[in-house]
């Protein structure tokens, strides 16, 4: 039986997944993220008509981390011809950890997709080439999408990531050695870590990502990207948005999704909904444990899946 989507349903779902808290692990390789309270739990849903449903800590902001990779790709699609992007980054799932160097070496410095670290670094490198102030431009984009003028980067998280960035620097220099990186590595890393350190709430994320449910149009009706590009990003999220847990997520949830190690996940029901969940404890793939379970329950209760 299909259940009506409302706040009470979302509250009920959070109640059901709350016992999972304590079974995952908060990301601790970024010291500033390790301090986040592990008991946080939130969900927000925004319809293409702008109707909002929420439960839990849905207005509390957190570090969106790799969810920002969708936003940087979106921004790149407005600045480059598509073939220019896909010459430098692929569209295939990686099947390896998101910060792997092994595959990159084997494949001549061309990352598998834009949602793993090497691919996102290439996208940031491309933005660095075309934008005079890429950090400021991203803030303008997300503030417009979310309808919130005070959205900002957490400079402490960005600094913490930059101070522990040896592996990402190695990835960038490896790509540079293959001729797939144009700008100064440290400058691009600063931009990349600021994007990851964007602080947003589930409510703001759900509103911001409506354009992927609404053929590329945001809540105001403005075209962010074309309908075809929105469909293509959803396809990439489906195959590559959940690190090396994309198959598990497709099986359990059945929606395009993008996660971040801050514990957030954004999921899309094309033509209908944008959903954001947050629970900081992660599973072995780096995806929110309780967040994934909440999306699985929601998918079942409202009978929504792309399959």
From Swiss-Prot:
GO terms for biological process? Answer: glutamate biosynthetic process; glutamine catabolic process
Gene3D superfamilies reported in the protein's UniProt record? DD-peptidase/beta-lactamase superfamily
Q: Which GO terms describe its molecular function?
A: glutaminase activity
List the residue ranges forming a coiled coil, or say none. Answer: none
Under the heading InterPro entries, the entry gives:
Beta-lactam/transpept-like, Glutaminase
Q: What is its EC number?
A: 3.5.1.2
**Pfam families per the record?**
Glutaminase
Reaction(s) catalysed by this chain, per the record, are:
L-glutamine + H2O = L-glutamate + NH4(+)
Q: Which UniProt keywords apply?
A: Hydrolase
N-terminal signal peptide: none
Annotated residues for binding of substrate: 66, 117, 161, 168, 192, 243, 261
Supply the enzyme class, top level: hydrolase
Domain of life here? Bacteria
Q: Does the record carry Nucleus as a key word?
A: no
Similarity comment text for this entry: Belongs to the glutaminase family.
Q: How does it assemble?
A: Homotetramer.
Q: What is this protein called?
A: Glutaminase
Source organism per UniProt: Serratia proteamaculans (strain 568)
Q: What is the lineage of its organism?
A: Bacteria, Pseudomonadati, Pseudomonadota, Gammaproteobacteria, Enterobacterales
């Amino acid at each position: 039986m299909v259940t009506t989507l409302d706040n009470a349903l979302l509250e009920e779902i959070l109640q059901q997944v709350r016992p999972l808290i304590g079974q995952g692990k908060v990301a601790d390789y970024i010291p500033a993220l390790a301090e986040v309270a592990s008991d946080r739990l939130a969900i927000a849903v925004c319809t293409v008509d702008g109707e909002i449903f929420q439960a839990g800590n849905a207005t509390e902001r957190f570090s969106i981390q790799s969810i920002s990779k969708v936003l940087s790709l979106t921004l790149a699609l407005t600045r480059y011809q598509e073939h220019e992007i896909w010459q430098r980054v692929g569209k295939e799932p990686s099947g390896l950890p998101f910060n792997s160097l092994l595959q990159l070496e084997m494949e001549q410095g061309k990352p598998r997709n834009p949602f793993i670290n090497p691919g996102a670094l290439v996208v940031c490198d491309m933005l660095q080439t075309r934008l005079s102030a890429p950090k400021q431009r991203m803030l303008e984009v997300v503030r417009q999408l979310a309808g919130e003028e005070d959205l900002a980067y957490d400079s402490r998280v960005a600094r913490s990531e930059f101070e522990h960035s040896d592996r990402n620097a190695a990835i960038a220099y490896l790509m540079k050695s293959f001729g797939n990186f144009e700008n100064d590595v440290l400058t691009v890393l600063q931009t990349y870590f600021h994007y990851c350190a964007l602080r947003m709430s589930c409510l703001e994320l759900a509103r911001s990502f409506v354009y992927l449910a609404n053929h590329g149009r945001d809540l105001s009706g403005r075209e962010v990207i074309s309908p075809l590009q929105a469909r293509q990003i959803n396809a990439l999220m489906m195959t590559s948005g959940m690190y090396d847990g994309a198959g598990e997520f497709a099986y359990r949830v059945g929606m395009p999704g993008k996660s971040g190690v801050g514990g957030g996940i954004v999921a899309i029901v094309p033509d209908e909904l944008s959903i954001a969940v947050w629970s900081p404890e992660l599973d072995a793939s780096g995806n929110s444990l309780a967040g994934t379970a909440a999306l699985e329950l929601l998918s079942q209760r409202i009978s929504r899946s792309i399959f």
